Amino acid sequence: MTYLLALDQGTSSSRSIVFNAQGQVVAQAQQELTQIYPQPGWVEHDPLEIWRTQLATAREVLAKAGIEAREVRALGITNQRETTVVWSRKTGAPIHNAIVWQDRRAEPTCVELRARGLTPTVQAKTGLLVDAYFSGTKLKWILDHVPGARQQAENGELAFGTVDSWLIWQLTHGTVHATDVSNASRTMLFNVHSNQWDDELLRALDIPAKLLPAIKPSSALFGEVSPDLLGAAIPIGGVAGDQQSALFGQACFKPGMVKNTYGTGCFMLMHTGHSFQSSANGLITTSAAQTTAQPEFAMEGSVFVGGAVVQWLRDGLRAIPSSSEVQALAESVPDAGGVMVVPAFTGLGAPYWKPDARGTITGLSRGSTLAHIARAALESIAFQSAALLQAMSRDAVQAGGSAVAELRVDGGACVNDLLMQFQADLLGIAVVRPAVIETTALGAAYLAGLATGVYRSTDEISTLWQAERRFLPALAPARAAELMEHWEHAVRQTVL
């Protein structure tokens, strides 16, 4: 039997999953990760806790699977993107907590970069917006605020990495300092056309090149896990940021194929092949997971509050005792009764980009109940995702392609049948849930398997992907369009 081990290091937890060569889950293990909030708008993780929890789950999952490390053909890594770690090359000790992707402390740097007129340069070279979301400004903050850090960086004594680089360094006992193109593309320092760090961007942010990891394709040999950690030297064969890994795990290998991950937020990616397409509709362009040195691209849109709206129903409104009960409450009414919830708790992301927006509930009447609000909250996830897909379809058509024909879904909230059916109704296309919804970890396993000969090609991997259920639209297109108009009207009311 052939086994692949995926390390899935996320924002809220570290997970490890063992897959067989057919892409089926054999065993999994998970440990929560402590969230650190030093002040409003700041979010940190302890890099040593990231490593401890990830190693512990890797050991645990091998035991659960009843296998030894020598039976594992390859290891893949997928990770929360943009989160920034800086450590000593000599001791391996972090010089500061990891600054998490949600952290906004670097916004003043972004204001300065925009004022200097760098937005067009950043967008042309990286596909990204100038935003504190991305790693480059977080790295600059560490260099500017940790005593002695900038001088140590100039001397080549420090290493920077996103979470994948940090894990690779630990797994190889500091012998490998590397990242893949998908993670590099989230730093605002990486030229997605040349697949290299960009000197002009490094100068703009005053970041020494000596800090940076080597860049490899997502499917490549990054080194071997030190035998003392898991019991054998396992090749590290795949590395990708979580959303690009999910795109790969969904077997979205051809231009125009789209996946949406329904997690705390929602992340929609459309593969655009070897074509770099700038969005005219509020999306960003990013590197897709690459199996060769040739660049591959994806368009991406991010919804800040997806499944988190269900947590708000539970913890804020106390409408439900547990998240799993939201579907039953929402199904207790035939529709939302004209109620619209726009969960702009932290502003609105793509395609609106309204940082000043705040959450609203509109359309309330004396007949409105908690069930109507719960249904409207659940439907808000589908409305936001529909706005993303419509933006992607417009971009695709403007670039000479076709409108999106099918949406592949994954993430925790995709198990909610009511939500998936409403999503299909709004979009007017099939929404397809795969048999294996652990697609983020599966993508890392597939990438590792490709690099080590378990799979011959992405065509072979495509044959392994299986649908569990297809949700077909059951709503008249005119009614779906009317609902989207109501949604857009509600969105306009979120900014005072």
Swiss-Prot record:
Inhibited by fructose 1,6-bisphosphate (FBP). Glycerol binds at residues 81-82, 133, 242-243. Sn-glycerol 3-phosphate binds at residues 11, 81-82, 133, 242. ADP binds at residues 11, 15, 264, 307, 412, 416. Pfam families: FGGY_C, FGGY_N. Keywords: ATP-binding, Glycerol metabolism, Kinase, Nucleotide-binding, Transferase. One of its GO terms (molecular function) is ATP binding. It catalyses: glycerol + ATP = sn-glycerol 3-phosphate + ADP + H(+). GO terms for cellular component: cytosol. Its EC number is 2.7.1.30. It is an enzyme of class 2 (transferase). Key enzyme in the regulation of glycerol uptake and metabolism. Catalyzes the phosphorylation of glycerol to yield sn-glycerol 3-phosphate. HAMAP family: Glycerol_kin (MF_00186). Belongs to the FGGY kinase family. This is Glycerol kinase. It comes from Albidiferax ferrireducens (strain ATCC BAA-621 / DSM 15236 / T118).
